[in-house]
Structure formats: structure tokens, C-alpha cells
Amino acid sequence: MELVSFGVEKLWDRLSQEYDQFKGVEDQVTELKSNLNLLKSFLKDADAKKHISEMVRHCVEEIKDIVYDTEDIIETFILKEKVEMKRGIMKRIKRFASTIMDRRELASDIGGISKRISKVIQDMQSFGVQQIITDGSRSSHPLQERQREMRHTFSRDSENDFVGMEANVKKLVGYLVEKDDYQIVSLTGMGGLGKTTLARQVFNHDVVKDRFDGFAWVSVSQEFTRISVWQTILQNLTSKERKDEIQNMKEADLHDDLFRLLESSKTLIVLDDIWKEEDWDLIKPIFPPKKGWKVLLTSRTESIAMRGDTTYISFKPKCLSIPDSWTLFQSIAMPRKDTSEFKVDEEMENMGKKMIKHCGGLSLAVKVLGGLLAAKYTLHDWKRLSENIGSHIVERTSGNNSSIDHVLSVSFEELPNYLKHCFLYLAHFPEDHEIDVEKLHYYWAAEGISERRRYDGETIRDTGDSYIEELVRRNMVISERDVMTSRFETCRLHDMMREICLFKAKEENFLQIVSNHSPTSNPQTLGASRRFVLHNPTTLHVERYKNNPKLRSLVVVYDDIGNRRWMLSGSIFTRVKLLRVLDLVQAKFKGGKLPSDIGKLIHLRYLSLKDAKVSHLPSSLRNLVLLIYLDIRTDFTDIFVPNVFMGMRELRYLELPRFMHEKTKLELSNLEKLEALENFSTKSSSLEDLRGMVRLRTLVIILSEGTSLQTLSASVCGLRHLENFKIMENAGVNRMGEERMVLDFTYLKKLTLSIEMPRLPKIQHLPSHLTVLDLSYCCLEEDPMPILEKLLELKDLSLDYLSFSGRKMVCSAGGFPQLRKLALDEQEEWEEWIVEEGSMSRLHTLSIWSSTLKELPDGLRFIYSLKNLIMGKSWMERLSERGEEFYKVQNIPFIKFSS
């Protein structure tokens, strides 16, 4: 099922599900469903064949318009019906005549749609379009193909990325560590060669880690600003506490800070993906002459060179050889060679070797091709794909990279249809943008992309993660699951894959991108697009292009550090009434008031006002009953939130402001489908409202004066599916006496406690599968380690500011068997830490920010897994080679001192 037939299928499902709503127009709806079924039979492989014939393309575009228009007609009618059902009997009687008119109008609209479908089918028959489409239809049964895909396990061994690179890594490490004459190493070559992968291997190499004191990695991109690059470097090289300060620094101050820092430290800075020599000229003033710093930069352009500079060397890695390409291809495409399900014969091997020649030795293209064939189990499938790649290359041979581009392009054509929509959505984001995966999942859900494949009990995030995993396995998206939470947190696109994504999105008229760097767009083109994304917007951008009544999605994306605002006129809400997705990050409105006309956007599924300059929310928000995602975390600290949520029964994600007006009172008991609720305040809402939210996976609670921990425990004990739980309390809350909490949630993986509590709960009252724990402001009177070290799956522990008020902590032998990361922040009374031999046997990273701790524990010598130690600068002398405590840390490869 291809892109356009996917839309038809969704529409057919909707008509079937809501059939009871269409009393009085059943005949018209039945006829429409029949026409849609007929249309589906003509659409097999239409998208795959539309490049062959302009007539096919025209028909596909017309069908898209029909599907969108029909969805709008049907949904508008259903929403009106639901509103009427909520009215009193007298009001419904008064509107009886109007209801009859609504049904007549619906019958007329459906009749018009049916005529348009008949016209398209007639055109397809008259001009032979049907034959063009069906000539290339696939022989594989869709269900069987999907079952094979579901059974298949893809290889994602990190060593796959390393095939053929061993010599390159060794040489680059030598340049950085052994060759002091070279301060700048340039890694150049075409896109997809594996430059970033190679740079990452070098950046994380143990020998390199041992050589330098500080490290910074910056993705430069085509549309960078000098200040953003300098800010990122300084943030990498200094403490996390300076992040906000650095964001607000002037360019001259950034320059001076970096210049001084690089004069006095051994630092490695990677500048990934510099496009022009002029870009390097902008960045380089921060580097003092001939000091301990080194730069590794990657670029597609070999002219990124230091003219006459003897401290510079260029390195161009070779493309993969045919044998190395074949080795890499086999590891991905044939991980289970010659199983009962998958037999690789000589003919298939020959086809595979022939196809990898089209990859030109580029590791990205080889991996994508391997991902394509990994899900193909028959000789027929391999032949079809081989011919498809060949035909694409014959059709377009201009340009050096045409073969590679089309290997990547075919990877898109071979995606299951639901993944095509998911992949195209990634075109929303700027180059090198770290995409928030959770938000992406809700974009998909709001547009109905993930509706048809969600299984019982599965959350929107579960479904979305499965999509990301499939795209990662096909080497089309770069991401990995967080080892602590098992979730995908961010993802991004390789440059070449992003070019394919943008090309396909433009070809499909999937969305329109407007930014300060893009050419001026034609308003007529924008008027035909149903998705509109603004990169770093200005008021002019929106005002110029807001008159598009068919707009489905309006998304704002910021790709750099800044605190800019852009003005949005309230009149836009009266002109784009079909919006499903509205993301207004950092917007501002006249007088700080969100216009009440937003309540007219009754089709909205996704609304974000994150960091918007809004002090007042209108009560008309209650009309947005289809919302599944709502973020009203605005940039005001005393915002009044109206009580508008009881009708929003479809909400899955709700983020409230951290600080609300004291008169705010919210009823949330109807939100039984919520999967994430953030900033729930016991001052503004009742804990009783939580009892019915049994689907919650994420919950952030703010406790007010008078709320006991026992009451809280009783209210949330039924939320058995919680994975991420955070408890905070308002400043000034005074807890008298000892209070006990029970937090025994079976699936809880991440727990954050920022509340005063003299003692931890007993071990049997803590989640047994907890992997991440963050404590702050707890003022624990007893050493927490004897309890926490018994959490057998704990991997990440942070004892942040004032979490412990005692003097001594002890980590005993055998404790913390899975702990990988430990952070110990400032504790005002903490003086002594004992680590027994055999404790924390898997610890990898240790951070200590304490001015009161008298000495490091001797037991650190026996933690052989410890690779990274981060300390305050006050420890530098004691831990230097001649320092009194050096023997405790001498086996740790990387030690960093930060202010």
C-alpha cells in the first residue's frame, strides 16, 4: 500500500468506524465507501510508477486532494454532531431544522466527492493510467511480506560501522597524539564516506582521551552562526552550571573566554561538517597560536585548507574497497544466512555484489542497501530490487553521485507506507538538528500516521519508538535507545539521507519550508501545501503566508541558541480552521493574550505554546476536544489557566505551567487516556483526579503545603504503568516529622525526588527495576547508600544539591552491581566517603562537585571499569602526578577538572 492508497485506506476505516453518525445520509456514505474501494483497486503501486507518466502523477495528486477534502467534510460534520449531543433537549429541538440542513449539506458534499472519484477513475481508464500502474505491481502478498518484516531481526552491531576504517583511525590518532606539529587535522571527502563515523571513533579513542584534558564536539552545518558555535564549544569545555550564562554572553566575551581557556589547556575540538573555507575563517579567531589545543574538522570540500599554514594537515579517507563493501553489506543484509527461512544462493550473492558497485564505496550507501535487502527473502525480491536500482540509474545519470543518490532513493520507495509518512516528516527539521523523538511521535499521531497500527495497550510513544527502530535498522535514521530508559530520546538524519528526504518531500508536495536562509517562496506554492514549517521565524514570514485555508500543520523550529520572539496576529486562527498541528514555540501575542479565536480550531490534535510570551489563556480552549497533545508551559510565572480540560478526553500528553496563578483550579478527572502529565500541582488540582489515569507513563507532581507523602502514595499507587516519576515541592513547604512513602511501581525506570524527606523509603518500597535515580533538596539525615546499593538494576545515580545532610557515606562490597554513572553534587556537611573493594564494579563515569569532602576514597583504585572522572578545579593539585592522592586515580584514562 503506497502513500496515496494509505490515505484512502485511512479514510475508508474512518467512514466504517463512524457509520452510525451518518443517519439520513447512509446511502451517500455507502456509495462513497464503494467508490473508495474501487479507487483502491486502481492505486496499487501508483506512487512507485508516477515518475513514469505525468498522467499518473496528475491522478495521484488529484486523489490526495480528494482524500484531504473528504476528511475535512466528514470530521467537521462529526464534530458538530458531538457538540449537539451535549446540548440540552430544548436546545436540540430548536436546532432540529438546522440539523436537517447540515445533513443535506453533507449529502451534497459527499455527492460532489463521489463525482470527483468517478472522474479520476474514468480518466485513468481513458488514458491507460491503470495499465501503467498495474504493469509494475508487486507479486508478493502484502500480509506475507509484513509478517516476514515483523519476524526479521536486523544487525546493528557497532562494529559494522567500523569495517575498513581501522587503518584510518590509527593514522588520525597518530596525527592528534604523536604529531605535535599539526594543530589542525582536516578530514575531507564526499558525503556518505563515513567521515563523521571516523571522527567519532577517533574522538572516543582511549589514547586520545588520555592525551587531552577537554573535549568539544560541534556540528557546524550550512546555516550556522559564529556565536552559536562558540557557545557550544564553551559549554562543552566548562561546567553545566554555566550553560545559561553562556547563552547570554556577547560574542566578544565568548571570544576572550575561549582564547584564555585554549591558551592554558590541552583541548580537542571536533568541527563536524564545515562547508566553506569562509566558515572556518569565521570560527578560528578563538584559537591562540601554537598551544595545546587541536582541531579535527570534517568537510566535503577539500579546499578547507590553511594556505601556507604548516600546522595544518589534510587527510582524505579512501572509499571502501569492494571486499570491505561486501563484508559490510553481508553483516547487514545476511545476518542469518542459510536459515530455514532465508537461503542465499549463488545467484543472490552475485546480484548483491553487482548492486554494491552502485554504492561507490560509500559506507552509508552500503548500509542502506543492506538494510533494504535484509527484509527480502526470495530470489524474486532481490531481482526486482536489483532491476529497480538499475532503472533509476539509467534514467538519471547526471552528476557524480547519481548512482548513490538512487540507492538511497530506492530505500525510500521500498519503505512500508506508514514509514514513508514518518520519514517524510523528518524534512521539518534543519540540518544537523537533534530531533526530539517524543514530540515527533505526537506529530505523527496528530496527523493519523500511527493510528492504524497501534496495538491494544500500546502508547503513542511505544508505537513511535517501533517506527524509529525500523528506520534505524534500515540505516535511514541515526539514533539509539537510551541505555537507562530504553527509549529513543533524539534522532537525526545523515546529510545525504536528509537531501533525499527533502527531495521526496518536495516531490510529494508534503510540506513547505520557510527560513531566513531559503529563497523567497511563492505564496501560490504555499497555498497548495498543507504543511508549513518555519525555521527561526520572523513575523513577516507568518503574515505573508497565513492565507491558506487548507493548511493542516503549522510548526515552528528553532535550530540555534537564542531568546528571540516573533509576533503572531490572532487573525490567523480565523483563516486556518482545518489545522491539526500547531506548534508556536517562542511566539508572542498582542498584550500577552492568546486570542480566543484559537477555540475555532476544532480539528486541532497538537498544540504547543512552549516558551510563548502568553500571560492569559482563553476559556475557548475547551472547544479543542480532539487534542491529544497540549503544552501550555508559557514564558510567564504567574499565568492563570482556565478550567477547560474536562472535555478533552482524547488527551495523551498534557504539560501545565510550572507556576500558575494562585486562583487557578483545574478539574482533570476525565483525562483517563493521559500517557504523560507534567507539572500537576496539588495546589491547583485534587490528587483524587489521578486515580483514573491508569495509562500514565510519565508523571511530574508539584506538592504544596499540607500534602503529605502518605496521601500522595495512596493516590498514585494504582498507576501501575508509570515509567518516569518526578516529585517536587514548592519553596517554603515545611515537613515536620518523619514521613514514609511507598513507591513500588513495577515498571518504573526513572525516579526524581526533589522534596524534603529525612529518610528514604525502605528497599521493599522502592521500584525494583529502577535504572535512573535523581535526588535533590531531600536533606536526608541517614546515609542513603545502604538502601540505594540494593537496587540491583540501578545504572545512573545523582545525589544533587543538598540531597544528603550527614557527614559520612559508605558504599559496601557487592553494592550497586549495575551502576554506570554516579554524580555527587554539593552537600554542605559531607566530609567522608568510604568505597569498599568490590563496590560499583561496573562504574564508568564519576562526577564529584564537593568543597567539603576531605579526600577521595581509597577504594576507587579497585574500580577497574572507571573511565571518566570529573572533578572541581580545587582537586587538581591533589590528583596531579605528584599529588598525594594520585595513586587513587592513576588508572582512570580521562580526568577533567572544571570550575
Curated annotation (Swiss-Prot):
Superkingdom in the source lineage: Eukaryota
GO biological process, one term: response to other organism
Keywords, comma-separated and alphabetical: ATP-binding, Coiled coil, Nucleotide-binding, Plant defense, Repeat
Nucleus as UniProt keyword: no
GO MF annotations in UniProt: ADP binding; ATP binding
Positions of ATP binding: G189, M190, G191, G192, L193, G194, K195, T196
Pfam families xrefs: LRR_14, NB-ARC, Rx_N, WH_DRP
Coiled coil (UniProt feature): 13-50
Chain ranges of the NB-ARC domain: 143-455
Biological role stated in the UniProt entry: Potential disease resistance protein.
Notes concerning its domains: The LRR repeats probably act as specificity determinant of pathogen recognition.
PANTHER family: DISEASE RESISTANCE PROTEIN RP, DISEASE RESISTANCE RPP8-LIKE PROTEIN 3-RELATED
Family, similarity comment: Belongs to the disease resistance NB-LRR family.
Protein name listed in UniProt: Probable disease resistance protein RXW24L
Organism of origin: Arabidopsis thaliana (Mouse-ear cress)
Gene name, Swiss-Prot/TrEMBL: RXW24L
